[in-house]
Amino acid sequence: MGSNIDGILRENLTLEELQEWLTSSEGNKLAIDDHIKATQGRVLPLRLLFNEFLRTISHIEQLSDKTPQEKFQLIRSKLQELYGKLHALVRDFQRLQPLFDTMVPFSETSERKFYPKETLGTAVEPVRPLASPSYRRPSNRSSADTPSSNAPTPSAAVVSGAALVAPQVKHQRRPRTNTAKRQPSVSASVVPSANSSGPATIPGATPLMLSGMSPLNMVASPLNGISPSRKPAQPHHQTTPSAALGMQPMQQKQMSIQAKATPSKSGTISSANLTPQSILNMSAFENSAGGVPNSAVPLNQNNNAIMGFPTDIDNIDLNALELGSLNMDLLG
């Protein structure tokens, strides 16, 4: 019976050939009917065996009386039995596949319609994987079934664009060593310009000796700070030697005019009355009796009238002065 079925149920079987083979002998029709029932009878045992296999795997940890090797052999035997029954079902079903192919043209020409509920026709074809990102790895190759894979992702485009721009940015950077090297030269050039802009006023600088002026007038006396109304000379009133030489003729005229307008009331100073007390009295009298504000008196005139000396410097006899009678305890 099997040989007869294999002889008629071949590939590319047409509906006319099947009808001619079935009508030629009654036994051919019974053979086809028995083979279909045998194949159908293999489905239920296979389902029961598959359910038993799942139950064994789920309760494998509860089999405490068996060793791990025995558990492995139990699962292996169930799996081999399941595989054998499934293989037999597939073999019988594939033998009936040419018969199932004739059902479509028969349903088109006949009033009775037959549609197979189960078929293994796609089993011989390679299974196409689904385009699911959950288990598929991203690949550069694109297939005809997944046209969306041909387009690059936005992240890849951004990364490629950034990779192209990054080298250009590095080449456009300028070295920073030039600015660091220029800073010492700029600072060095600024320092001489500040020194050459004008004379620096140093507080407490010793005034230079001028021609035609007494050395006593240029010496800074410590008694200047003891005077009740005299203010110490500010550092910014000091002048350079060149400016002092230019102002000397004008100062001499002012001193001569002041000497004529304001006669000295303190009398002529001699070695007899040159004491620290007389010097203090002369300095206080000069500041109070002048009647002119200190700001109106020129700075050089105040320097010439220090310690109550007369403005006419030429009349002083320096050789006749005796400084031995000065009380140095006051200065200490």
Curated annotation (Swiss-Prot):
Any single GO CC term annotated in Swiss-Prot or TrEMBL for this entry: mediator complex
InterPro entries, per the entry: Med3
Subcellular location: Nucleus
Key words of the record: Activator, Nucleus, Transcription, Transcription regulation
Bias type Low complexity, positions: 132-143, 155-166, 184-200
Start-end of Polar residues biased regions: 144-153
Subunit structure: Component of the Mediator complex.
Protein name: Mediator of RNA polymerase II transcription subunit 3
Native species: Eremothecium gossypii (strain ATCC 10895 / CBS 109.51 / FGSC 9923 / NRRL Y-1056)
Gene: PGD1
